[in-house]
Structure formats: structure tokens, C-alpha cells
UniProtKB/Swiss-Prot annotation:
Native source species: Ensifer sp
Cellular localisation: Cytoplasm
Protein family according to the UniProt entry: Belongs to the SHMT family.
Annotated residues for binding of (6S)-5,6,7,8-tetrahydrofolate: 126, 130-132, 251
Name recorded for this polypeptide: 2-methylserine hydroxymethyltransferase
Site annotation Plays an important role in substrate specificity: residues: 234
PTM sites of type N6-(pyridoxal phosphate)lysine: 235
Chief place where the protein resides: cytoplasm
Record keywords, A-Z: Cytoplasm, One-carbon metabolism, Pyridoxal phosphate, Transferase
Residue spans crossing the bilayer: none
Reactions it catalyzes: (6R)-5,10-methylene-5,6,7,8-tetrahydrofolate + D-alanine + H2O = 2-methylserine + (6S)-5,6,7,8-tetrahydrofolate
Cofactor: pyridoxal 5'-phosphate
Amino acid sequence: MDHATRAHFTMTVGEVDPLLADALASERGRQQNQIELIASENIVSRAVLDALGHEITNKTLEGYPGNRFHGGGQFVDIAEQAAIDRAKQLFNCGYANVQPHSGTQANLAVFFLLLKPGEKVLSLDLAAGGHLSHGMKANLSGRWFDATNYNVNPQNEVIDLDEMERLAEEIRPKLLITGGSAYPRELDFERMSRIAKKVGAYFLVDMAHIAGLVAGGVHPSPFPHADIVTCTTTKTLRGPRGGLILTNNEEWYKKLQAAVFPGVQGSLHSNVLAAKAICLGEAMLDDFKVYARQVVANAKVLANTLAERGVRIVSGGTDTHIVLLDLASKGLLGKQAETLLAKANITSNKNPIPGDSPRPPEWVGMRLGSSAATTRGLKEAEFRVLGTVIADLIDAEVAGKADDVVEGAKAKIAELTNTFPVYGQ
């Protein structure tokens, strides 16, 4: 073996690329030393990490198990079939496609399957918690399809099902979508399904954020009400970055295979497929049900603690992992609060809330989530501490005295991160 070949197989990141080695080491330290409260994030298991970094990543394949366009795929077939079987069992459905590289690509494949360009879609407004891939103009789905948005009731900030029904009858959409990226309340799949059937629409549930809660039995399942379901394997499902498409319709499933490949994707990501199979297997364990219950319990404690300190909680609380704050109640913008919390080693994100400005710099909302910190082992007592720390920081910022409390807040966060380390650090 010559020197170049030996170096290719043996040199570490630090030897090959010091810049990236330093960035990776810093990111590892950031994850250990900060409390992650971004609702779309979680912390994968060591087993999932091992799969993502496995040599299986070298294998290029197109097609599906038993029907590939390349040889040498027998072991990837095992991984993909395991992921398919586990997804079907976990979500109690007849068919599963586990190849989508993301939730957005899963949604695009469903659009590709069910709709023709220009056909009508009815989905949740972005500021009310919807998602870009549900027909928003900034997304490809909004350029190809004619989307109308339903909203939340301005009094209770819960999805206005009467408005949904009225709009559905008015525009007669081909596809009704529910789900999104910042909606904290339980979804009434049964009523929505009736609305879709009433107007002859297909009913798509995007459960990207709540898939783990559905798997853990703390949120109702979209089946048997949904015609088709998409989700990510990240977020509450606690797996790698990727998507799933689920259905009970055999005829659709056969067409769906082609909608994913070659419709919107080429070769699959072999390492991610293996990691998906692992995370789906983990989600079938009793421990995961305990985890899902704790995620919701922790989010409720966080919401209640902040509400007791005068922070307005959008919709008055949460049924999921998401807690939405209306910082206009404190005279702050979302970006201000995001920057403030970062100084204390709490990671969060600004977010629009119902009725918010369309311009991100003017958003008065903040989205928090309990999934990642719950994975670290934090329970109600620790989330009460987090809520108190966040409220202290907000009140100090309003009073112009944030610098006086940041160091104390950082010390409390350091105590939590040291008590609840990640990956045995």
C-alpha cells in the first residue's frame, strides 16, 4: 500500500483538516455546555451516531430492497427492510417508504403523487404554526400549487376548525394538510378527516414534530383518519435527519415508490437508512414511552413556570413538546430574547406567532421545546429551574439590567449540563 492510499484510510480529521477538526470539537463542547431548547432539535443515541459514521455510507444504491439498480446491496436491504417493518409496526400502518432525505422531500413526493401543478391545497398559516413545504410562496410547493391557509381562532389560538371547513367548502382543495413546525396543541385528526371527505380532498398529516409523541402514545395517531402521513425521523422521534411517508393505501404506495425514486430523489443515503432503522427500533421500547410522557410533562412545567412570571404563552399552554412565547407581553422581540438566552448558554429560536409580522426581524415570538433536554435526563424540577432562569433573564432585560444576571444564569445552566452530560462527557 502506497503512502497516499494508507493516508486515505488512516488519517484523522485533525490530521487532514485542522479547521474542521477544531469546528467539530467546538460543536461537541457546545452541545455539552449548552441546554438545547430549540423544538426541532434532539440528541441521537450512541447507536444512531455509530450507524451514521459506519462504512455502509460508501454504498451507492437506487431502487428498493430486492429491486436495486446496483449490486452489492444485500446488507443495505436488511437495514431498509428493518426500517420499513418497524415504521409500519410503530405507527400501525400498512405501508412505509423510508427513503426521503428530509421531511420537505417527503412532502414534495406526496404532492408529486397526488396533485397536478396548479391544483389547490389548504394548509395551516405559517405564523399560526404551519410549514414552508405546505404551499408557502417561498417554497417550491407554493410555486407549483395554489395554496390557501386556514388559521387559528384569535381568541384561544387553537386551529379554527370551523374556518377550515368553511374554506374547504369555498375553495374545494385537492389536498388538505395539517401539522407544522410551531403548533403546540393536540390535533383533531378525526374532525379534519371529515372535513376533507366532505369536499372530496385527500388528507395529509405532516407529523414531523409529533412523530415521537405519537409513537410514545402521548398524542393521538393520525391513522386511521389520514390518507397519507409524512414525518421526519429527527425531533421527537430522536433519530437521524431524514423523512418517512406512511399510508394504508396499497395503490398509492406502489405509485409512491416511484414518486420518491426516481420522482424527487436519486440514490439513497445508506448510513441514514441504517440509523433510521435503529431509531425506529428504539422508539418501540417501553423506555421510549416513558421518555415521550416526560417530554410533554416537562414542556407543561416550562410553560407554567414562565406564565407565572408574566410571560404570555401562546394558546395558554401546550399539549406537546413545544412552548410558544409572546414576548410582546414583555416589550421584547424574539431575536432579542434569543440572543439574551444564548449568553446564558440556552439555545432557542425566534419564531412567528399568530398575527405576527411577516418580517423575521420584527417577530415577537419565541419557540422553545423540551425534547433534547429531556433526552439528557432533565425532569420537572430541572425544567422549573430553566423556566425561572429564562424569566429572570427576560425581566432583567426589560429593566435594562441583563448584564447583572447573565453570569448567575450561566452558573445555573452549567450546574445542569454538568449533572446531565451527553455521550458520557
